[in-house]
Amino acid sequence: MMIRHALLSLFLLVLAAPAAAQSMRTGGEPARPGFGTAIAITGGQVLVAEPNGVRSPGAVYVYGEQAGSWVEVARLGAESPAAGDLFGASIAASGDRLIAGAQEGETGGVAYVFDGEGDEWRRVARLSASDAVPSDSFGTAVAIAGDVALVGAGGADSSRGAVYVFRRDGAGNWSQVGRIAAPAGMLPDDRFGEVLAVQGETAVVAATRADSGRGAVYLYSGEAWQQAARIAPDSLTANARFGSAIGIADGLVLVGAPGFNGFRGAVYAYGTEAGSWTELGSVPFEGTPQERFGSSIDVAGEVAWIGAPGADRFAGAIYSLGPGTSGPFGAEPVKLTLIDSLPQGGAFGVSLALGENVAAVGIPGEDYGMGSAAIFDRAGDAWTLANRVESEAGSGLAAMTGEPQTCDGQVGAFSCSNVDLVAFLPVASIGGDRGVRLNDIWGWTDPETGKEYALVGRVDGTSFVDISDPANPVYVGDLPKTATSPGSTWRDIKVYQDHAFIVADGAGEHGMQVFDLTRLRDRENAPVTFTVDAHYTRIQSAHNIVINEDSGFAYTVGNSGGSETCGGGLHMIDIHDPLNPTFAGCFSDPSTGRQKTGYTHDAQCVMYRGPDEEYAGREICFGSNETALSIADVTDKQNPVALSMAEYPNVGYTHQAWLSEDQHYLYMDDELDELNGLVDHTRTLVWDVSDLDDPVLVKEFLNPNTTSIDHNLYVKGDKVYQSNYTSGLRVLDIADPVEPEEVGFFDTVPFGDESPRFDGSWSNYPYFESGVIIVTSGYEGLFLLRYREADRPIS
């Protein structure tokens, strides 16, 4: 039974919906492994794809039934497997044959054909386009029927798209025998060929982005694959994404439009009359907004299963559809109760495969995007859950403790220069379950004992780690996220008067957690699961929290979801009494931000003692406001004043900034300039802020050693400590404030290259008296590092 491809981009939208410090809300998430993103059934076996494994190549897992249980019997991969190859992003099966798409370097994409015999699978062909270019996205969709394979290349011809036809000859060799070009009138970015299905001599090809996202489907027939029809219901709305899923069986075609009618979704049926394709009607479905009915479809006999991964707050659902009085698949769809409890955000039904007596459904959002799949057995008319299957968790890195390790170009798997490894703890050893990633980090020194602690943000809470013996750090305990909030990629932590203040973005009614850090002294039964000491609810979600320890005020920024958002700007909170925080006012500068609301992504607020004497002793905030630098005087919380805003060339996303210790210069990172190709190396912006009414950009430092995205940076003395995602911690010397030089680094991601992507080192804290620098890296874990003064810059 063939998989009916479910469009991966819609799946990513599903996962983004329930989740939004220091990484921008629109785009600052790492790629998710997505076990279960694509599924197929063939020969009594279930095949489950994981195209983007954590630090591992994409793979297709093969499950067979043994003694009443489904177990892994094989694992398939690319010819030269590599992390990020996206092997299995699309799969399809027919008989004893599997085809899987993959992306390999600058090839433009490939597809592999495997032949199976029992539990043995052999890679028999590597397919590529005869006219391939790197932007083709060849392999994003595949379909196979016997000795014929179709491979979609949605990026071909300026993303108009194309489909390549391959055939197996009598000697068992596969070769390209045709190319189906995008139909006339197809526009750039319509991406013809992103979804495919084939049966016999009928091929179905979708262009889901055509016609303002309404979508269109084309049918082809005969050995020469001549266009037989174009189908697109008149009732389609913009962004309906008609063609996102296709089911085909015995001359009938079902087509999903999961974006239809407020993402309620719809499915349409088509058949042939007198040799012409005609619409038989739409499947009757009322639904609710965001159900995304029609995201996946498969057919077995007279029954079709249809996925609705957005149902029940993205827990997901499957509907069964059978024959009715109006014809095949004419009955009312029935929502199946297949699993008693599904996780919110799991997106059950993004993918599915239906056989006569076995079915499988992907749950790629489970465990924060690690994903899983459910396999069902049929007895009579009843389907029962047989097994939940999943891939291994974690990055495969072991803890490194006991003795500090001096950097000599390499420490274990990690490349480095002038930065030594004191210790490393993987995510799992500090409270992270399957799929959990780390994000923000801050530090606290106990004034009574002198012990230093790392306060480590996770997707699902905050970990506390005693680093007073830095070579032997101890996980002390966990403060879980607010009970009703979903996990969040974006968590942020700051400290005031021995209390931690914690916010999260895209996290529903999370609010601000307040935790008394002196409770970490009592740890007889470590690790301890803690509860909050106070909970501030005048905000719901916030992207970051800023604290001015000299004034006793906190500022949540990037607020959303309800309550007092302050336009996404500064929500000011009096925290002089940490356990009784009180709202103090709002500030936003509507001349900044993508929506011109004054949205502040991050900020630093200080009691000003810099060179501009006009503002001496005032409380000044330096905001990174998506599109510009914003400087404000917030001394009077009821009457804050915008002093200035400053833009700069090639802005991608103004992300975060930190002052030099004399408050003369401000060092800023932009999160999207590297990713969007606006600069060709990692860029640090240097501002002269000696005149607060007129900040001047004096330097754009392009680091010749990296091309990664710069994320969070902090200044201590004459050094800037940058967490730069895939290139890890970078140390810049600013003895000459306007001529930074890189003098050290520790790459926290020992997998893949350093190309710009949201993956790796999130943040760091360099302010401990011990000189230990604590660094988080998403899937890897917590690093304790120490910088060694360099004799010369890295070149």
Please name every model-derived segment.
Residues 1-7:
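Bacterial N-terminal signal peptides that target proteins for export
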Residues 12-13, 482:
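Short, linear, compositionally biased motifs with a strong N-terminal bias
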Residues 16-18:
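N-terminal signal peptide c-region/cleavage motif recognized by signal peptidases
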Residues 21-795:
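Feature marking well-ordered beta-strand scaffolds used for ligand recognition
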